[in-house]
Amino acid sequence: KTFDRDLIKKLEISDHILISIPPINGKDIVIKYFGEVIKECNPKWVTYLSATSVYGDHKGEWVNEESETNPKSKSGIGRLEAEKSWITFTANSKLLFQIFRLSGIYSNQKNILVRLKSGNVNLINKKNQFFSRIHVEDIANVLFKSLSNFKSGEIYNISDDKPSSPEEVTLY
């Protein structure tokens, strides 16, 4: 596959690389198409944005970075496979690397109020189903702070620390 030469040139001079592209068919395409370029530019900061869906169903129990990963959804399985690919790739390349597992992302344009106004809401009430959320501005702040406080090899959950049921969020 060929890519815009300007994109390759920009990658070659990058010292910070943020991977936010989700896996396609369970595989990370960034390593596939740009791995060698990333390895050669030897960035001082490589961060992969994953998702808390890698944990799967913990029956209402809270999870943290040490919790067992056992994804059931296609996207969660793909994210975990991508994480493993990046961990192996960066270890073999001796690149500094971290993972941020993002919870349910919302913004001013994507949130329950927008869905309520559009009539695109299903009130879900499942026993022991909780999820946390994170605003896009909070994600940006975490990424910015990690530029100067980078710890290679770490995995961080990025969420609001207020797990709620889908019903609670909708009724709020």
Describe the role of every protein-language-model region.
Residues K1-I8:
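Glycine-rich, highly charged phosphate/nucleotide-binding loops
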Residues K59-I99:
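Catalytic helix-loop patch of NAD(P)-dependent Rossmann-fold dehydrogenases
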Residues I87-F131, V136:
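NAD(P)-dependent short-chain dehydrogenase/reductase
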Residues L18, T47, Q98-F100, Y156:
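Hydrophobic/aromatic beta-strand patches that form the interior of the parallel beta-sheet core
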Residues I8-Y48, K84:
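NAD(P)-cofactor binding segment of oxidoreductase domains
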Residues V142, N149-Y172:
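Mid/C-terminal beta-alpha module of Rossmann-like enzyme folds, strongest
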Residues D4, N25-K27, Y55:
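Short glycine-rich, flexible loops that bind phosphorylated cofactors or substrates
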Residues Y33-K74:
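Conserved Rossmann-fold NAD(P)-dependent oxidoreductase catalytic core, especially the SDR/UDP-sugar
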